[in-house]
């Protein structure tokens, strides 16, 4: 698995190094058009290298997303983020992404949420979302899970789930959760999602 990570990091580092070089060119007076043209070449090379990487390793992204190593999960999320593989019908992967969107570490939550939102996978897989939400409610929650779930519902612009979440929280006798309920309620009142 170390080779897998090292090879991906080489591809990623090459992208970052070349992108920095292009930014430096632009800042040193090279025309915008030339800088954009150069950056497009860099991105094309990056996507080509990622495709070769995927063909070489043929990774099972669902398995990688469930790995205990957060580095491996991050690489899997970045491979999905790049959008080079159509995963829109992979229900297991969608379940894992939804779970990571709520219960993952900060970086995982952000990446998984952006993937789900940008690809429109939540609309197509609403039953999966509702099943995961009900499972999480059944397991009970603390301040952090309540906060992360509320933020997730806000980020996906699902006011119905956010309002239902607030109602569920009202049954819990916890001052910190009550503060979150007030914050989420103010968000709903202050703007329409």
Say what each PLM segment does.
Residues 28-52, 74-87, 110-122, 144-156, ...:
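Structural detector for internal amphipathic alpha-helices that build alpha-solenoid repeat scaffolds
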Residues 70-71, 102-107, 139-144, 174-178:
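Alpha-helix N-cap/helix-start positions at coil->helix boundaries
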Residues 1-82:
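N-terminal alpha-helical scaffold/docking segments in eukaryotic complex subunits
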Residues 90-119:
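Helix-adjacent hinge/juxtasegments
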Residues 52-64, 87-100, 123-136, 159-169, ...:
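Amphipathic alpha-helical scaffolding segments comprising HEAT/armadillo-like alpha-solenoid repeats
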Residues 65-66, 80-85, 98-102, 116-117, ...:
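Ankyrin-repeat helical core positions
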Residues 2-12, 16, 160-193:
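Eukaryotic acidic, Ser/Thr-rich intrinsically disordered low-complexity regions
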Residues 10, 18, 41, 66, ...:
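Context-gated lysine
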């Amino acid at each position: 698995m170390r080779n897998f990570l090292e090879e991906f990091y080489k591809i990623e580092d090459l992208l970052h190094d070349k992108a920095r070089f292009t930014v430096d060119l632009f800042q040193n007076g090279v025309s915008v058009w030339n800088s954009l043209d150069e950056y497009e070449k860099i991105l094309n090379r990056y996507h080509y290298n990622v495709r070769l990487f995927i063909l070489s390793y043929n990774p099972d992204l669902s398995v990688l997303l469930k790995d205990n190593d957060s580095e491996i999960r991050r690489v899997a999320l970045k491979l999905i983020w790049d959008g080079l593989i159509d995963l829109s019908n992979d229900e297991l992967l969608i379940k894992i992404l939804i779970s990571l969107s709520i219960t993952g570490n900060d970086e995982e939550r952000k990446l998984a949420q952006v993937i789900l939102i940008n690809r429109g996978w939540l609309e197509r897989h609403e039953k999966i979302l509702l099943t995961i939400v009900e499972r999480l409610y059944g397991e009970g929650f603390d301040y952090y899970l309540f906060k992360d779930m509320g933020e997730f519902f806000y980020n996906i612009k699902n006011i119905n789930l956010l309002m239902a979440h607030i109602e569920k929280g009202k049954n819990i006798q916890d001052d910190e959760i009550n503060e979150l309920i007030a914050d989420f309620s103010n968000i709903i009142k202050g703007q329409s999602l």
